[in-house]
């Protein structure tokens, strides 16, 4: 008997998931996609299985703008375990070295200012970065270590929240591409005792905060009670991640031409940069870029939601 193909729903929007411990970002995405029965889905940058917290999941038309969330600043709280280093710089790796911990709160407070601002980081071997088409973590699992070029990242916030024994909790605000495992490992070396990430929780992704998230258990409960459609109430608008962008409103006439690929003028447009665009009904219709002549050129358009 032939298997009946599941017809997926054409839904658009963003679900802010509090990613559970032990899930890869893709596993979490596919689970929510199944619950929602969504036709198209994507996430906005990976969180390690060890990590929990804010993971924006994009569906339908919202996937067109996931790159802009990927490029946004992030916030984390992490527990730094001092006295040991591991192969993965987190609790899941093999212990490589154990050292005595003779430092306390005052020592950590004295060290962390040097890691604020623009710093250079060498990406860890256990990362998704690729060398000759191969993810570094696959090379690492095969016992290979390759040279990695240091990359510039920005640490806008680095604060010590608490310190007890050999563990310290840190709050971090950083630019895209920052590896918290590398940051913690580097702080550990600066302290002279080594360190790794024992816990990691993302508290912010762009404009989204932890308080806005929904748990997988809540989504499963809603699905059990009302099916796929019951999850629609958790969907945020497709432009939710762009709320910090300048907003331009187009007249019905201008919106028609803009949606057909033509650059148009708008009285409330800024002098330059990227903008999110709404039509005369206040409906989000895409993003544009203000050109030198003041016209708004369409960059990504959205179908009617």
From Swiss-Prot:
Its EC number(s): 5.4.99.25
One Gene Ontology term of the molecular function aspect: tRNA pseudouridine(55) synthase activity
Key word GTP-binding present: no
Active site: 48
Catalytic activity: uridine(55) in tRNA = pseudouridine(55) in tRNA
Protein keywords: Isomerase, tRNA processing
Domain of life: Bacteria
The keyword Lyase is annotated on this UniProt entry: no
Family annotation (Pfam families): TruB-C_2, TruB_C_2, TruB_N
GO biological process: mRNA pseudouridine synthesis; tRNA pseudouridine synthesis
Family: Belongs to the pseudouridine synthase TruB family. Type 1 subfamily.
Job of this protein: Responsible for synthesis of pseudouridine from uracil-55 in the psi GC loop of transfer RNAs.
HAMAP family registered for this protein in UniProt: TruB_bact
Full protein name: tRNA pseudouridine synthase B
Organism: Pseudomonas entomophila (strain L48)
Highest classification ranks of the organism: Bacteria, Pseudomonadati, Pseudomonadota, Gammaproteobacteria, Pseudomonadales
